[in-house]
Design a protein with these regions (language model features):
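Short periplasmic/luminal acceptor-recognition loop of GT-C membrane glycosyltransferases, typified by
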Residues: 405-439, 565
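Membrane-interface micro-motifs in multi-pass membrane enzymes
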Residues: 67, 113-164, 331-343, 415-416
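Extracytoplasmic loop-helix module adjacent to an early transmembrane segment
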Residues: 12-56, 74-79
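Short hydrophobic/aromatic helix or loop-helix immediately within or flanking a transmembrane segment
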Residues: 38-48, 60-83, 258-268
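Hydrophobic/aromatic-rich transmembrane helices and adjacent perimembrane loops
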Residues: 144-152, 195, 275-286, 304-356
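Transmembrane-helix motifs of polytopic, lipid-linked glycan transferases
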Residues: 13, 90-117, 155-158
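Signature aromatic-anchored transmembrane alpha helix within multi-pass, membrane-resident enzymes
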Residues: 5-16, 173-179, 224-228, 283, ...
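Hydrophobic, aromatic-rich transmembrane alpha-helices
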Residues: 202-213, 277-302
Length: 641
């Protein structure tokens, strides 16, 4: 009988997975979430390394590099699918299937009743929530969005419970070794793991120890080993990752009220916006309170179930508490994955244990209702959009045709377009990420994509600064493009093979002139002819600085055109040429700015960059002295060697 029931739920599970595929290939709203630039991190990385001879040490990885479990899962997806389009859906199915396995395992080690039915029902609900395009539930389909750390947490929790209830010493050692390895790999991959798993596990064990009056040190050794391995994993990031992008997390109460408001809105959207999940969440709160009283009273029956409820609640509290105190990051739904996913798992495991055989009828009713809802949405999406076995929008086709005609392959685009076009083009394109002022964006990309010269630029007409690449900046450096192709909302500026520069000065003989009003200022204001003059003659400070352009090793000359009403020979200010280094500027040359009696004159100087200073940012500063008139007109830099 149980085998037949499991077959029913296996069928329901398969139909739920089929709905994921149906909505994906019919272009539903989940597709846009899977195709944004952040979500295309692993497809781009794996294609570069496995197909284009790329090296991982050339990459600027995500701040949480997601080595485990995301990399092994995506490797399977990469081997299973010939294109990024098929690899993305393959990954979604693999991650969803592993979530089922993890839930099944934790149900088996806690209650060992209806484990398959419980895991199937939980996953059907989670898939339904995901396909309703509600975050963070939709992230079960995404790679590299913190879901992998949550998946590891479920698996590790099941192994931890199994370890604590294992009688054989050899098996306990094997389980502890496996736990330590997974904890190390996950902490190396995502610091969020420490918050959602390690901290609440320590707190749960401490609470249980106090409730049971168990203060023996030897019983704490496995927990200490797990904590040490997790911390070592987190610390190892600085030795493992070549180009580090992990940023510090600032904690304080400065944004507490706004953070709490954002968290409240996310919770309200998840619960009030979805009555079924809202009801599950209310049941979850009741289960946590019930479990808390049972543990305090020292009841041993169902202890593992109560322990699971307390752990999940402490994980929820740790997540929400820490996120509410962060001052340098915005509140994103992906930070609430454990807080909103654990209630579904815990409630179904608890109901399965309490209802026993009757749980089958509740589970099949819930599964059929949610499956019917998913199937209706999938049918509507297929009727509206059709089925696309390949993803090749007209906009990308238009761009490909234009580039293929001119035999162009190396180009630039804004951050949100670069990986998208590179992945879904039928051409072997190399597209580097650049900002509006043509600066390189070293964020989730490879160093090898950036070139001294390119062939084309893709400009999004509907993008806003600082994302939209400036056509004016391109034409000032390179002149008018050879061809311009309009493809939907994109403009393709085609200059020809290696005919387009983004750096103003690259080769010997290159020069560039900045009007003073294009440079930053502290005490100046713009003049009618785009110069910069002092707002207040009594002030002193930087009249102009910048331009922060990266220059290659070589020798350069510069000219600062300026005027001052001060008499000749009188000092009106100071100038210097510096490397804009992260901690402090390094002065390469400096001198005085003298009066010109109102005439326009030039300061001419030289500077050189050695091999250790290649591509450092250069800044040429003018510092006005008090009670002296000074106007900067323009700045010119020439590469002479």
């Amino acid at each position: 009988m149980n085998k037949r029931k499991n077959i029913y739920f296996l069928l329901l599970l398969a139909l739920s997975l089929a709905n994921i595929v149906a909505q994906y290939i019919s272009g539903s709203s989940i597709q846009s979430r899977l195709f944004n630039s952040d979500a295309l991190y692993l497809p781009t990385l794996f294609a570069d390394i496995l197909s284009n001879n790329g090296q991982i040490n050339e990459w600027f990885l995500t701040p949480a590099p997601y080595f485990f479990p995301d990399y092994p899962m995506f490797l399977l997806a990469y081997l299973a699918g010939p294109t990024p389009y098929s690899q993305i859906i393959a990954f979604a199915l693999i991650q969803t299937a592993l979530t089922f396995f993890a839930i099944w395992l934790i149900a088996r080690v806690t209650i060992n009743v209806n484990s398959f039915i419980t895991a199937s029902t939980a996953l059907v609900i989670l898939i339904w929530l995901a396909l309703s395009a509600r975050e963070p539930f939709a992230l079960i389909l995404n790679s590299a969005h913190h879901y992998g750390a949550f998946l590891s947490s479920i698996l590790l929790l099941a192994l931890w419970i199994k370890f604590n209830n294992e009688g054989q010493i050899q098996r306990k050692i094997i389980f502890l070794f496996l736990i330590a390895i997974i904890a190390y790999a996950t902490a190396l991959s995502d610091n969020f793991f420490l918050l959602q798993f390690v901290a609440p596990l320590i707190a749960t064990q401490a609470f249980i120890s106090m409730a049971e009056r168990d203060f023996a040190f030897k019983n704490k050794i496995p927990l200490i080993i797990l904590a040490i391995c997790s911390l070592l994993g987190s610390i190892s990031y600085k030795w493992v990752v070549e180009n580090q992008t992990r940023y510090p997390t600032n904690i304080g109460i400065d944004k507490l009220s706004s953070n709490l408001k954002d968290i409240y809105e996310l919770l309200q959207s998840a619960t009030i916006g979805n009555p079924l999940f809202g009801f599950i969440f209310l049941l979850y709160v009741g289960i946590v309170l019930y479990s808390l009283t049972k543990i305090i009273r020292g009841e041993k029956e169902s202890a593992k179930l109560y322990w699971l409820a307390i752990f999940s609640f402490l994980s929820l509290c740790a997540t929400l508490g820490a996120v509410s105190l962060v001052t340098n990051l915005s509140i994103e739904s992906r930070y609430l994955i454990p807080a909103l996913s654990w209630p579904v798992i815990v409630v179904l495991i608890f109901l399965s244990y309490r209802l026993r055989d009757r749980f089958f009828y509740l589970a099949i009713a819930i599964s059929l209702l949610t499956l019917a809802s998913m199937s209706c949405s999938s049918h509507h999406s297929i009727i509206s959009n059709g089925i696309n076995k390949q993803y090749y929008p007209e906009e990308i086709s238009c761009i490909d045709n234009a580039l293929e005609k001119e035999n162009l392959h190396n180009g630039i685009a804004q951050y949100w377009d670069a990986k998208y076009f590179q992945n879904f083009s039928r051409l072997n394109l190399n597209i580097a990420q650049h900002s509006d002022n043509l600066g390189e964006i070293h964020w989730i990309t490879s160093k090898k994509y950036f070139k001294q010269a390119y062939d084309f630029a893709i400009i999004s007409e509907n993008a806003a600064p600082p994302d939209k690449i400036s056509s004016e900046a391109l034409t000032r450096i390179n002149g008018s493009p050879k061809f311009v192709e309009t493809c939907g909302r994109k403009l393709v500026f085609m200059y020809g093979k290696d005919k387009m520069r983004v750096r103003k000065i690259v080769a010997v003989g290159d020069s560039y002139t900045w009007k003073a009003c294009e440079l930053p200022t502290r005490i100046g204001e713009k003049t009618a002819d785009c110069g910069i003059k002092k707002k207040d003659g009594t002030q002193s400070g930087y009249l102009t600085f910048g331009p922060y352009d990266q220059l290659h090793t070589g020798q350069y000359t510069f000219e600062i055109a300026y005027s001052s009403a001060a008499s000749k020979g009188k000092t009106a200010g100071d100038w210097d040429v510096v490397l804009a280094l992260p901690k402090e500027a390094k002065v390469l040359n400096n001198g005085l700015i003298t009066g010109t009696e109102g005439a326009t004159e030039k300061i001419v100087g030289i500077f050189a960059l050695d091999s250790g200073q290649d591509l450092e940012k250069i800044e040429i500063r003018t510092l006005a002295r008090p009670n002296v008139d000074l106007t900067v007109i323009c700045l010119r830099i020439d590469r002479v060697q």
